[in-house]
């Protein structure tokens, strides 16, 4: 076998390996785009508010490619819920790093009209609660873990000496945060919506700040 033939074979093999690696990278990137699009749209329209075809279109992909990434729509729903929860967690944790009155800063950010109105990137603990309640165990477990992380964070931020007492207050605070935003979004009276947010914020800061 001539040297040039050997070189050609090696080049072809390397080219095939490159294409294979490139294909895997493309598939992973496309998978991520689908999950990201779903995480945003599910928060905006609800899990049942948008179909696979529209989600794939949002991701810039064809409907026919969906099942190369997911065995079922439920698999996508679960991954998207997990993604949305992680994104919300990072945002809340970032606010809580403010050195001066971190609890008050978190309350103000969570109960702001900006958070109320920005459903697409908002905290999924509030936005997807009803959807998760009707979802599978994996999604509910992810939601439960996120609630646990928020409670741990609030327990650290709330003043007091006794761990049990601070955890009880943390549960009350988180329930108020989630409930106030949900109600503020649901009413069609902007003045009342703002009153709900402000009253909840004032009460939380007075009790726990």
Which residues are covered by each model-predicted region?
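Hydrophobic/aromatic-rich alpha-helical bundle segments in the mid-to-C-terminal region
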Residues: 137-145, 158-209
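Short, basic, alpha-helical segments at the C-terminal edge of helix-turn-helix-like DNA-binding modules
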Residues: 82-87
